[in-house]
Amino acid sequence: MINGVFLREIASILRCDLSLIISEFEYELLTKTFRIDAEILFYLPFLAEEIEKNTTSFQKRQHFVSIGNFLHEPNWQTVLKLKQIWKYIRKNLPEAELHIYGAYATEKVFQLHNEKEGFLVKGRAVSADEIFRKYRVLLAPIPFGAGLKGKLWESMKFGLPNVTSSVGAEAMSRDLPWNGFIEDSDEEFINKAVILYTNESIWNQANENASVILEQVYCKTVHIQPFWTTLYKITDHLDNHRNTHFLGKILQHHQLNSTKYMSRWIEEKNKNLLL
């Protein structure tokens, strides 16, 4: 876990006056495991300004959907997993289709397209909002990747229940009931996808769960005022804040000096080249 990228990110946090952390899991990891001072961190997740109540009903929706740009490796691996398990879902629901959306889809992605199997690669979505409003179930067997998943948050906003993995649901809902199902085994994932697609009462309950999650975890009014209070407190006492968290000053000092001496080295090297 501790590698060059990790050390660079921790150093960046220490050099900053305040870092915004969108995941409670990562916030606790930083404060409890790596002992980063909570005064230079602020938990600020995705913010839901207004919760949409009149979402498209179960009966007016159809088909499964997966969405995510293909520059992000977990999205590609998610689609590969769906390609493996889709035939088993399709066996139970022969009229259902799975539509795959995502920007930057290359030829290898479009090669997965198979109309006979009902596995349709659509490419870039013109309007993500429209996508979330017309499908019945979002499938997201995400195999790896940290942080909050935007597609799952959007699915809550637009009344689109989902089946995802424990990685996908990480830090998304605290301990509140999920808006769908969280399954890591292929067998259970397939089973829950079929149930969520066919059982209207379970589907409606999933949407009720989504409303609760949005109100208790992502409500803008809950988070925004404490954020501004913290920001103004730091800016009003900036020198004291920086002196208290002197590790950041040490790192900035060494970073600036390393740049200064590197520039001198380059100057001397260029002089020698001109001789």
Q: Whereabouts are the PLM-identified features?
A:
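Short acidic/histidine- and often glycine-rich active-site loop of Leloir-type glycosyltransferases
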Residues: 166-177, 181-182
